[in-house]
């Protein structure tokens, strides 16, 4: 990973000679933005903390800032989104599930930098093992990784072409296509995941009372029916406002992938604005 980052850095340095380049990197899991240490990355094949900022600054001789990938989405939404709201949440539903919060216009990280780990809220204490070491986390039910794993077992039982499953994976495109084509078992798996997301989100809404939520990630490809299942699960919130302005709005995020990735660069903007004048 570090070698790939270094290669990309030097490629841009050659292309933009004489221009000072600073890096901003987003990774999943728990990140200490002050030290630039990736503390835990559940989906990675390694389990020890990685001092990304220190290692890259030593190798490249440039400034590096590191934060969580959902913080990246939150900053992208804050600075590039069409709606100018002070409180909102972004949720990334992809191979894992994460979230980030903007409260009073500021990123909320928590003292231990572990806020937003909605994917590791426990849905079923007796459920499947999660990469984080616990059991029954939301990710084990609703993430793309979990649904693909269950779908592969189902497809093998249905006599699917062994060559198509030779790599031991079901692709995202294949999963989305079967869902859209009305495959009953695949739809049941996806709908179960959507209901689980809605349940976790319902609990978050009652605690934080944030009424603007944007969903990102490849799971958004399941479409409007998937979104409505999530919304329906959160619709029983007794503390939600009934008026159109203050009621909870859960929507697909509208930022392009390029805009989303640009979000991590706003770490430098946020830091500059926070400095005393």
Where are these regions (language model features)?
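Solvent-exposed beta-strand sheet faces enriched in polar/charged residues
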Residues: 26, 67, 92, 216, ...
């Amino acid at each position: 990973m570090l070698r790939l980052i270094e290669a990309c850095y030097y490629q841009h340095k050659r292309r933009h000679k004489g221009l000072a380049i600073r890096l901003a990197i987003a990774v999943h899991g728990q990140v200490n933005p002050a030290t630039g240490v990736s503390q835990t990355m559940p989906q990675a094949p390694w389990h020890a903390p990685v001092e990304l900022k220190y290692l890259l600054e030593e190798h490249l001789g440039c400034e590096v800032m590191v934060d969580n990938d959902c913080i990246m989405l939150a900053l992208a939404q804050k600075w590039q989104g069409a709606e100018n709201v002070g409180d909102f949440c972004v949720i990334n539903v992809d191979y894992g599930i994460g979230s980030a919060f903007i409260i009073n216009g500021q990123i909320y990280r928590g003292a231990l930098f572990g806020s937003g780990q909605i994917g590791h809220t426990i849905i079923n204490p007796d459920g499947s093992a999660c990469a984080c070491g616990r059991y029954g986390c939301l990710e084990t039910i609703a993430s793309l990784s979990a649904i693909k794993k269950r779908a592969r077992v189902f497809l093998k039982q249905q006599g699917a072409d062994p060559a198509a499953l030779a790599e031991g994976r079901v692709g995202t495109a294949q999963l989305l296509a079967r869902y859209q084509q009305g495959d009953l078992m695949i739809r049941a798996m996806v709908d179960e995941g959507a209901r689980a997301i809605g349940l976790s989100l319902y609990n978050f809404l009652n605690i934080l009372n944030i009424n603007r939520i944007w969903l990102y990630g490849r799971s958004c490809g399941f479409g409007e029916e998937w979104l409505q299942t999530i919304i329906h699960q959160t619709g029983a919130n007794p503390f939600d406002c009934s008026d159109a302005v203050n009621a909870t709005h859960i929507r697909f995020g509208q930022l392009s992938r390029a805009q989303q990735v640009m979000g991590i660069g706003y770490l430098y903007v946020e830091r500059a604005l926070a400095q005393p004048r």
